[in-house]
Amino acid sequence: MSGGIKQWPEDERPREKLLKRGAKALSDAELLALIIGTGDSSSGRSALDIGREMLQDFGGLRNLAHATASEICRIKGAGPAKAACIKAALELANRYGARRFESLERFTSPSQVFEHFHHEFRDHRKEYFLTLLLDGKNRILKRVQISEGSLNQSIVHPREVFNQAVRESAAAIILVHNHPTGDPTPSREDIDITRRLREAGDLLGIKVLDHIIIGDGSFLSFVDRGMM
């Protein structure tokens, strides 16, 4: 559909469609168009055209979220103001996911952890390993990042993992890390690290409840798989 969005039939305009049918009725490109706001008068391209080009050039929302403002500005019609609006909207989405997790009183299932962390990790190209510290009633005390980059036993050392747990008087911990490849299948290194940390936790009286690997749209729980 050509021409400015204002010239389109009302039912096809992203803003009117959202108000009438709800945000879920809109495509990713239409939601981006609302954030972008205006098109490019010099080329006659609408905000929706620009949104579609962004998704195509970056290969989807995941890569767009990882792009810098300057990279977004390379799209014709997307200047610094539009790039800033897009980065702000994506950051708000990330913060919303984080707040939902922080409001949880206690850990009840691996899927809870996945629901939070897949939003946070999906844009990362590196592996991140962190721990969730829990009290005796499985209430979340704190999250602690242990390492960034490829996992190995020299980086994910029991001393680093349990240092904060001891300081916070944690009764248990949950291990969490991501696989940037998107496949949550554990490597031999993942399995060995989990065994080593579980043994160290037993000696310290701090139970390792689970190790959850976050993939792209899926996760693996060591406990659910009977691996610990």
From Swiss-Prot:
InterPro entries: MPN, RadC_JAB, RuvA_2-like, UPF0758, UPF0758_N. Residues 106-228 form the MPN domain. The keyword Nucleotidyltransferase does not apply. PROSITE patterns: MPN. A motif (JAMM motif) lies at residues 177-190. Keywords: Hydrolase, Metal-binding, Metalloprotease, Protease, Zinc. Gene3D superfamilies: 5' to 3' exonuclease, C-terminal subdomain, Cytidine Deaminase, domain 2. Zn(2+) binds at residues 177, 179, 190. GO terms for molecular function: metal ion binding; metallopeptidase activity. GO terms for biological process: proteolysis. The keyword Hydrolase applies. It comes from the Bacteria. Belongs to the UPF0758 family. This is UPF0758 protein Gura_4138. It comes from Geotalea uraniireducens (strain Rf4).
